[in-house]
């Protein structure tokens, strides 16, 4: 009995222990080679699976979110703020757009400083206005642009004009035709001419508004008049 106890004490002190036989474990080479399927079918502990899954993920790396999973705050920040223009600003912008559709950087900067707007906003307004103008031009709803000269010559609606306004066609009727032949005083007796002849101004803008309608008499050439008899002059002189 002393022999086995001494042997066990020596095994405990050396740290070497035999495998217990009741567990059914055998560490021989034959047993290991004969049972490969049994080793594969053994369930792995859950702790090992968790460690393997942790090792596959790189520490410190974050997966990128798809665009649809982005927060709403980021989408709101990306939206552009719409600019509200005042009436004076729109008038200045439309006036320059009527003059040119493609202003350069210097003109845009001057206009932006005058109407208190950023130059980028002015550029965006011109881009949108050009697109709107092209769309209206294609649809056929675009009205003919007014020339700057016509805008300056147009009379205001509240202007009080005394007398009839002479149109260009009416002005041409006042100017005597150049092909008319003037009757000289030597061809007619002196009694046919009054003492004072009112002079008609030659400039249309010097004419005063006439009370009645304008009538144009045809000019009769001098060769259509028959020669005057000497007695006719004496008759006209006695009648006057």
UniProtKB/Swiss-Prot annotation:
Domain of life from the UniProt record: Eukaryota
DNA-binding region: 78-137
SMART domains associated with the record: HOX (SM00389)
GO cellular component assignments: nucleus
Main location: nucleus
Annotated spans, Disordered: 36-82
GO biological processes: negative regulation of intestinal absorption; regulation of transcription by RNA polymerase II; regulation of vitamin A metabolic process
Record note on disruption phenotype: Mice appear healthy for at least 1 year and display normal histological features in the gut. They however show defects in intestinal gene expression with a dysregulation of the scavenger receptor Scarb1.
InterPro entries listed in its UniProt record: HD, Homeobox_CS, Homeodomain-like_sf, Paired_Homeobox_TFs
Compositionally biased tracts (Basic and acidic residues): 62-76
Cysteines engaged in disulfide bonds, as pairs: none
Keyword Protease: no
Keywords per UniProt: Activator, DNA-binding, Homeobox, Nucleus, Transcription, Transcription regulation
Tissue-specific expression: Expressed in intestinal epithelial cells from the duodenum to the proximal colon.
PROSITE patterns per UniProt: HOMEOBOX_1, HOMEOBOX_2
Pfam families: Homeodomain
Gene Ontology molecular-function annotations: DNA-binding transcription repressor activity, RNA polymerase II-specific; sequence-specific DNA binding
Keyword DNA repair attached: no
Gene3D superfamilies: Homeodomain-like
UniProt-annotated location(s): Nucleus
Described function: Transcription factor that regulates gene expression in intestine. May participate in vitamin A metabolism most likely by regulating BCO1 expression in the intestine.
Official protein name in the record: Intestine-specific homeobox
């Amino acid at each position: 009995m002393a022999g086995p106890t001494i042997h066990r004490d020596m095994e405990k002190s050396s740290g070497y222990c035999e495998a217990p036989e009741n567990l059914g474990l055998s560490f021989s080479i034959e047993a290991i080679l004969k049972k490969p399927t049994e080793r594969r079918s053994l369930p792995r502990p859950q702790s090992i699976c968790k460690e393997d899954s942790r090792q596959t993920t790189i520490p410190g790396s974050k997966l990128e979110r798809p665009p649809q999973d982005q927060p709403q705050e980021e989408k709101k920040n990306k939206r552009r703020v719409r600019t509200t223009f005042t009436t004076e600003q729109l008038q200045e912008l439309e006036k320059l757009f009527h003059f040119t559709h493609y202003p350069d950087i210097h003109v845009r900067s001057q206009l932006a400083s005058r109407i208190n707007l950023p130059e980028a906003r002015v550029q965006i307004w011109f881009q949108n206005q050009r697109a709107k103008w092209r769309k209206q031009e294609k649809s056929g709803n675009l009205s003919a642009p007014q020339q700057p000269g016509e805008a300056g010559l147009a009379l205001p609606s509240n202007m009080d004009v005394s007398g009839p306004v002479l149109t260009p066609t009416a002005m041409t009727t006042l100017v005597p035709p150049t092909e008319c032949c003037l009757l000289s005083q030597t061809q007619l007796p002196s009694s046919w001419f009054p003492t004072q002849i009112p002079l008609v101004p030659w400039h249309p803008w010097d004419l005063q508004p006439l009370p009645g309608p304008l009538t144009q008499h045809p000019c009769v050439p001098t060769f259509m008049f028959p020669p005057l008899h000497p007695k006719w002059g004496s008759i006209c002189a006695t009648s006057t």
